[in-house]
């Protein structure tokens, strides 16, 4: 029973780590409760850095790689 629980927990963790994270660059700031003109100035710049995360694998026999032949597209 313990082995099957460990296998189920491992599968749940593996699926959870495989889920993509969606985020967008944005800037939202506010200087709340500023006592004067020169205090509480807020400057924010949204930054978007495209990241290539597909096809970054190294192995000896490339044909046996599960990523072989997959298509990849960058944002």
UniProtKB/Swiss-Prot annotation:
Q: Does the keyword Signal apply?
A: yes
In a knockout, what does one observe?
A: A double chpA-chpD knockout has no phenotype; a quadruple chpA-chpC-chpD-chpH knockout has delayed aerial hyphae formation and sporulation. A quintuple chpA-chpB-chpC-chpD-chpH knockout has a longer delay in aerial hyphae formation and an almost complete lack of sporulation. The quintuple knockout still expresses ChpE, ChpEF and ChpG. Quintuple knockout chpA-chpB-chpC-chpD-chpH has strongly delayed aerial hyphae formation, makes many fewer aerial hyphae but no effect on viability of the spores produced.
Instruction: From the record, give the cysteines joined by S-S bonds.
Output: 54-72
Signal peptide position in this chain? 1-23
- Which ranges carry the Chaplin domain? 34-74
The yes or no answer to whether the keyword Secreted is present is yes
Induction annotation: Not expressed while still submerged, accumulates during aerial hyphae formation on minimal medium, no transcript detected during sporulation. During aerial hyphae formation and early sporulation on rich medium, under control of ECF sigma factor BldN. Expression depends on bldB but not bldA, bldD or bldH (at protein level).
Which InterPro entries did the record assign?
ChpA-H
The cellular location(s) given in this protein's UniProt record come to: Cell surface; Secreted, Cell wall; Fimbrium
Keyword entries, A-Z: Amyloid, Cell adhesion, Cell wall, Disulfide bond, Fimbrium, Secreted, Signal
Family under the similarity heading? Belongs to the chaplin family. Short chaplin subfamily.
Q: What does this protein do?
A: One of 8 partially redundant surface-active proteins required for efficient formation of aerial mycelium; the short chaplins assemble into a hydrophobic, amyloidal fibrillar surface layer that envelopes and protects aerial hyphae and spores, presumably anchored to the long chaplins. Chaplins have an overlapping function with the surface-active SapB peptide; chaplins are essential on minimal medium while on rich medium both chaplins and SapB are required for efficient aerial hyphae formation. Chaplins are also involved in cell attachment to a hydrophobic surface.
The protein here is known as Chaplin-D
